[in-house]
Amino acid sequence: MNHLTVQLYVENQWHDAAQLSFTDAQQGLRAGCTLGYIPNYLVDCLDKEQSCLAWALSANLPLGWDTYSGAPVWAALQDMTPAGAARRFLEQRYGQLRPTDMAMDVFLLSQCTPAPIGHLRIKEAFELVASVPSIGFSRAEVVQRDHRFLEYAYEQGAAIGGATGAGGEAPKLLLTETADGLLYPDASMADTRAVTHWFIKFPRHKAGATDKDILRSEYCYYRAIHQLGFSTIEQNGLMLEEGSKPSLWMRRFDRKVESQHVRRYAVESIYSLLKVTEPGSYLQHLDVLKRLLNLWRSERQDAAIADLVLEYVRRDLLNQVLGNSDNHGRNTSIIRGEHTISLAPVYDLAPMVMDDEGITRTTKWPQTVERGGNVDWFAVCQLVSELADLPQEWLYQQLRDTAQQLLALPDLLQDLGLPDKTWQHPRIPLRRLQQQFTAWDLC
């Protein structure tokens, strides 16, 4: 197999949007691949030529007649394909089915991408799933991680992270609920039957006491920051199910059920935007902001730049306050709508400083302003305001105002039942937040 068809959902229908070709399928993506929009799709979208909005596969692959290759294509594909522990599980479970003339990354792309996050899918992967009868499971079976259910979920491409075994990260699942309350892997259910699209997370690793508390804390965090006005996971339906192991149930922000159809939103990670092809790569906040600013300006969103910059800096302050050190380039995304581009809601917000693996920040400010986990927020505002051509005094005052808002977090989180282990952790400053903000010159 040297070619795959990338399908794109926009204006309430799927389109055969682009053809992906491999230089050598046996050597995989590293050997090279090219991507070109399909002429019929381009003709249908003539008035959208050069657009980076929802009609494009990526902000780095604007709609047009050019053929793309290299890092922009590879980075965009990595937003779609299973990674990390999910990939390791799939390799073990289905690797023996891989043809000898096809590399594992090409095989997974062709088999395991029927309904990834966002508005893209691989046509050939979806056709494989569509040929298999769909099976629904009760919420209780999902909560209890019924073995039969997990096997089926992986076969249908519903798992985007983790593995079923006790030795690895637990799965993250993409499931669709129908009117009868049963849950199906997203790709196996017709849009006309969909009621709710769920993103479900289980504890990491072997689901030890700390892993469970991290997940419980994540639930509390979403509840609390919503009350403070941050754009985050939808509160309706947000639930922590305990069961034998806790599971966090969240409505997906890349799906919206409307009359007789499902709206799918183009979600693109910061890694993809920066053409980063190595998972876990270190980034500089200023490089991320520079790319976002260029994108906003290219789409004539200059009037929204101040809000973008403030929100970006506010979110990093929030990460520091809540001990979320896992700030790699796939934990922040943009949504490319049909009219505008925006930051995706806050997601993957958890006290990862508690994790036994010792997770550290992978996206940082320059060493002159961030050392050993301590950030000089006044200096950050100076650098960012210069980059974005904004008044430094305004940005710094807005960040101080945010700090005043965040002083409500300790009470909010305690009322929500934040685990004591999180509350007491030495690298999470919630117990001494006023003192910490004073040290940061934010109070």
Description of each model-found segment:
Residues 1-443:
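Phosphate/dinucleotide-binding and metal-coordinating scaffold of catalytic cores
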